């Protein structure tokens, strides 16, 4: 009442404002703040069946599998669904996208960039120090410094002890 006791949300917001985000930008090449939240670009137009699938997914507590034919926009449906989830629950979300081949990691990454979703490309041949990045982002997520993390990985890398142990630490 006298201003000395602050709610968790107020303290968290003040703390996040005080961070030198340029450090993260220098280390990771990006940082996340409110102005850089993921969004659906105006250039993306979803079809009625995609919107219906997203609504059904939301009604099912954001759980389910999209079973759609080739070329019907599964990736866009999935990414716009992620945006819906991030808007509904704006913190502590771990997004893991598993694909069968490394070139699909790259394709998903290119699509996620259009929606301003920051991600880690995690697979064995990636030259970037993605394992360190993943550990850092999980630490930040667990300590309320980061609202979400997104890992795109291959099925083979997903099955590794390294990734499984990190997922269990979230």
Identify what each model region corresponds to.
Residues 1-31:
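Signature of lipid phosphatidyltransferase scaffolds
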């Amino acid at each position: 009442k006298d201003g000395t006791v602050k709610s968790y949300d107020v303290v968290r917001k003040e703390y996040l404002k005080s961070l030198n985000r340029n450090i993260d930008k220098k280390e990771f090449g990006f940082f996340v703040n409110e102005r850089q939240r993921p969004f659906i670009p105006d250039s993306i137009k979803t079809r009625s069946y995609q919107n219906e699938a997203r609504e059904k997914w939301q009604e099912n507590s954001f759980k389910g599998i999209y079973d759609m034919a080739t070329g019907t926009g599964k990736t866009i449906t999935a990414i716009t669904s992620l945006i819906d989830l991030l808007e509904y629950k704006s913190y502590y979300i771990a997004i893991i996208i598993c694909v069968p081949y490394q070139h699909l990691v790259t394709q998903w990454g290119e699509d996620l960039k259009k929606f301003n979703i920051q991600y880690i490309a995690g697979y064995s041949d990636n030259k970037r120090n993605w394992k360190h990045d993943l550990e850092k982002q999980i630490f930040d997520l667990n300590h309320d410094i980061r609202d979400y993390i997104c890992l795109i990985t291959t099925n083979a890398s997903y099955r590794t002890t390294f990734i499984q142990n990190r997922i269990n630490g979230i």
